[in-house]
Amino acid sequence: MKNNILEELKWRGLIKQVTNEQKILDAQNSNDAVYCGFDPTADSLHVGHLMMIITLKRFALQGFKPIALIGGATGMIGDPSFKASERVLQTKQQVDHNINKISTQLKEIIPTVSFVNNRDWLEDISLIDFLRDIGKHFNLSYLLAKESIATRIQTGLSVTEFCYTMLQAFDFYYLYKNNDCSVQIGGSDQWGNITSGIDFISDTINKNNKASGVTINLLTKSDGQKFGKTESGAVWLDKTKTSEYEFYQFWFNQTDEDSINLLKCLTFLTKDQIEQLIKQHNQQPAKHFLQKALASEMTKFVHQQQGLDKALKLTEAFFSGDLFSLTDDLFKMALNSLPNTQINKDTKVIDALVELKVASSKREAREFLKNKAILINNQVIEDENLVISSFDLIQNKYLLVKKGKKKYFVILVK
């Protein structure tokens, strides 16, 4: 049974702007296609893309046919919208490699999605045809009035990037005409590009068309910071770049306030289910009901049940200290997720702590040991003169070092 897609988006706090609400609902009733564009700027999507991926899936669950447009052509240029400077241009080989990787990721997350590549229809348009058939419909003052372009004019905007909005407008026109696609969704920075597409359709096909668009709020943390970055950089959807364990921990480490917002924006839990979680969490905050639900839902969504099971096993092993039961596969995941270094088996604990960068100096290492802040294989260590070879090794080659409550390191004993 279909629910009103706009009501669903509204209670979750997702909508930034809508061009025409009635057209969106008409498109839902007609089971039209909806599309979202992804430019292949890297060989993996990251958590910053999840807002749009999940919104595309929400539309799919409410009767729309989901289309992921991969920008094989526009990705060669780069979207200037609200960017501080021009992107470094990628080679065609880089773009093709990224397209293959991203398409595979998206297909795993949204199995019903259809893929289109705008290179298929943009690559063969000659410069003369572009100027006559597309450029003719865009007034210069109209483009300069777009906030996404106006913000870059002062710092410098190349003709290449200036043409981007026209290419994206043509994408919407092409899908509207050939794929029964009447709705485009995008991030809050895409309003100018989406409305350009609708205006182009109005100008070239029919003023009384059914094209419409929705922009989605930028996901920010409660302190105003941009969401999705950590001290070590982006959190990727590719498990070879960000392991399932790291991915799970990223969500688990969100604040209570951010967790509530993320459960609404990024999961498919109902309003009642989220309210029940909040109630449980308020009664027993130490059990982290909100964070556990968020981390589980997100890890399962991106890495399926198998990926979630791996993350939970590793999390439980770290918490309980039962590291000897870990499979080699899981310990390799831990190794990729945690700071690690090779250390000689005859090295003293105090020297190993400095080598592993657990402590910045021997003096600091002694302080940690004195305060019982160092655990090796889950045993509190106080003797700085113990040598690495005196410990039982996990799988005959590893030691797990823990500093305080949350910081883990791995020693590869040689």
Curated annotation (Swiss-Prot):
Any Gene Ontology CC annotation: cytosol
Catalytic activity: tRNA(Tyr) + L-tyrosine + ATP = L-tyrosyl-tRNA(Tyr) + AMP + diphosphate + H(+)
Chain positions recorded as ATP binding sites: 229
Residue positions of motif 'HIGH' region: 40-49
Superkingdom assignment: Bacteria
Keywords, comma-separated and alphabetical: Aminoacyl-tRNA synthetase, ATP-binding, Cytoplasm, Ligase, Nucleotide-binding, Protein biosynthesis, RNA-binding
GO biological process, one term: tyrosyl-tRNA aminoacylation
GO molecular-function term, one example from the UniProt record: ATP binding
InterPro entries found in the cross-reference section: aa-tRNA-synth_I_CS, aa-tRNA-synth_Ic, Rossmann-like_a/b/a_fold, S4_RNA-bd_sf, SYY-like_C, Tyr-tRNA-ligase, Tyr-tRNA-ligase_bac-type, Tyr-tRNA-ligase_bac_1
Root EC class: ligase
Residue numbers covered by motif 'KMSKS' region: 226-230
Binding site for L-tyrosine: 35, 164, 168
Subcellular localization(s) per the UniProt record: Cytoplasm
EC numbers for this chain: 6.1.1.1
SUPFAM superfamilies reported for this sequence: Alpha-L RNA-binding motif, Nucleotidylyl transferase
Domain S4 RNA-binding: 347-414
PROSITE patterns: AA_TRNA_LIGASE_I, S4
Principal location listed in the UniProt entry: cytoplasm
Role, per record: Catalyzes the attachment of tyrosine to tRNA(Tyr) in a two-step reaction: tyrosine is first activated by ATP to form Tyr-AMP and then transferred to the acceptor end of tRNA(Tyr).
Subunit structure as annotated in this protein's UniProt entry: Homodimer.
Protein family: Belongs to the class-I aminoacyl-tRNA synthetase family. TyrS type 1 subfamily.
Name used for this protein in its record: Tyrosine--tRNA ligase
The gene coding this protein: tyrS
